[in-house]
């Protein structure tokens, strides 16, 4: 699965560069973004190439399905508010969004691939019950708040083959302990994180509230303060990952959140790391979708080789 997925991006880029409008039909997400109809982005729509904010913003904020090919560095003065049924894909190794990240609210069926996003308030933010979103092969760093935050009833998301670096609070999944947020988020926030490289980021990989099941598999955690935090009766399965020099691989109680979460860990590899906290049982993701694990012994090699842009 890992080799096919990693190669798929290169094949997709090749198709874009040669045909201008093609889509690799077998290049689909694994995990929560694949269920309940799946996530296809702008498939079936026109392909538009953009290289500045003046072209990107109206295209991303338009109604029709579109495949947006981002070339070079695009400077944004504010977050890009992407409408439903869009694919944003960077062309080559240097497609970059700077200054304003990507904001998804009350939208669905979005694919974000092969983009470097940095120096924004949030690199990517999902809220307002956004659903069916796939973030794949991106490089996210150096933002003011979060790199990839998912909250306010958002659901059915896959985060795969990304590199996160030069940041503190990385991936928030559920933003508040309050009762009204509990009612909003319970039954939602189902996210799969796989084959991501958390490269020296400090916390929140992710920090989870209320969601179940959240699936964290085959990721490489390196030089982090903590890995995964399951809080507020969330249920998280952490399997087949590598934790290297991570003080606290997992938490089930953290910060000022009053209630613990549930976390099951299995088949993880711990290198110069602390002891994981575990608690309770979690709904199995296999009841919702199929996935294939890479061997934990291979993760520290294949993830840095395959995660991030132009991989």
PLM regions and their residue ranges:
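A cross-family glycoside hydrolase active-site/sugar-binding cleft signature
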Residues: 71, 149, 172-174, 207-209, ...
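Extracellular beta-rich repeat passengers
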Residues: 208-311
